[in-house]
């Protein structure tokens, strides 16, 4: 990719149907192993692992959080995520690591390098936000529908298709759960797909007009499209996904990541 991609997906420790605090588990492990680079507070609680990333917990303390080192290659980010998940397992080998959120806030946020995003006009930023959300709908279509429905019922912005943050360096796409880190294949395909569509939107904004027919024009419209995908309205949702697939196949980086994109388009391979 011509830019770096990263993430901070979350997970939970579960043992005998009981959920354990990631902070308590990791703090004990850190004390036992005398881990260095430990951060007790701030946004990134946990510890760093050289050249891989960091492992810790989110502000709620119950959920674990992995922060792989950013890279231009989705395959490298996937490898780092795998190594961090292994490290998380070593913290409590008897527990299962769950990426299914259900009633828990388990986000799978993806970070896209966007150093010039905030320099653009508010109108342009909004168009780009809606374009990314529209093209990312195939990823939502692959998520556990029960998960998505529960997230939707929780209200607020949690799981909202337009949920995003920018900090002058990255654009954080926040609607997804962490299910996409469940297997290396889904993980790499998800990161690559996000890279393909972000490259078209961010590096070639002039192309947005070419596929404007599948881009929501208002916030209400994109949320309506999200509902169609989540509720699987037969021919309507299939038709929408087919149109997105047709346009993405024309994108600059599609051929480079063809296998990954087609993996995302094939729901049967994921569910």
Model-derived features: positions:
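C-terminal accessory/tail domains of diverse enzymes
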Residues: 1-102, 115-271
